Amino acid sequence: MSFRLARGSTMLLRRAAGLRIECQAGTVWLSAYRHPDDSVLQAGESIIVDSDRDVVLSGLPDAQVALMSQVSQPLELLP
């Protein structure tokens, strides 16, 4: 699944364990619930969520983002 994340908009990914988040264009800021460190992905970079936390994504500025499940569970996306 791929989508555009406009500057300043956010998306909540619920229970994101095993999800690969790839920034295809622009820059994406990621913050995981109760995780001390945030991450910033530039175009071409990706990260795999290693815990069952909720993750918030934000475009800095606009970004193109791809989500790929590494486990067999449905993705639940909330704007």
Question: What annotation goes with each model-predicted range?
Answer:
Residues 1-3, 13-19:
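A generic structured-segment signal
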Residues 45-79:
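C-terminal structural segments of small proteins and small subunits
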Residues 32-34, 69:
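Short, glycine/acidic-enriched capping/hinge loops at junctions between secondary-structure elements
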Residues 4-5, 23, 60:
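Histidine- and aromatic-rich ligand-binding microenvironments
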Residues 17, 34, 61:
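A short beta-strand motif that forms part of the nucleic acid-binding face
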Residues 2-5, 10, 35-52:
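Short acidic-glycine-tyrosine-enriched beta hairpin
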Residues 11-13, 30-31:
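Short loop/turn motifs at secondary-structure junctions and domain boundaries
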Residues 16-28:
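Glycine- and acidic-residue-biased ligand/ion/polar-headgroup-sensing regions
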